[in-house]
Amino acid sequence: YFQRSELKQKEGTSMWAYNETFYQIYPIGFCGVPVHNDGVPAHRILKIGDWAEYLGNLGIGSIILNPIFESDNHGYDTRDFRKIDCRLGTNEDFSEVCKKLHSQNVKVILDGVFNHVGRGFWAFRDVQEKKWDSPYKDWFHISFDGNSCYNDGFWYEGWEGHFELVKLNLQNPAVVDYLLDCV
């Protein structure tokens, strides 16, 4: 907890966020999605759009949505940064939700995790399949001299020791370019 008066504007930042009332939603929980991604599409994210008028009436200026990208389980194990998790719906569903929120003057902020990805991330899957021959092997911190706890035939760095969260090599310009292209 902190007082708004304690916030100091950093040089070059927009002032709107310092005076905003934020509302945070973890869509995977809020929308009641299955814990594990079974690939079955559902239009659950539309539930957030149903709350747009209520949020506007509360005086909410911005909504923070925890990860909504295609993921293996909890959202922080991203498979695809360009696609809404099928358990939540489609990119078109998300666009509709944004329009409803914007009609109530509610901004949308996405929680994007760009430090690591899930084991289902397309480039990591390519490394699992092709090993040394994968053009994406340098996208991760990998050693072909060891083995992972998943018996991949190579060792890799997982975020904070969590090997379902594959750490990206952010020193690789191709990785950075890919991530910037996604945002």
Indicate where each model-derived feature is located:
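Acidic/aromatic-lined carbohydrate-recognition and catalytic surfaces
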Residues: R4, K10-L180
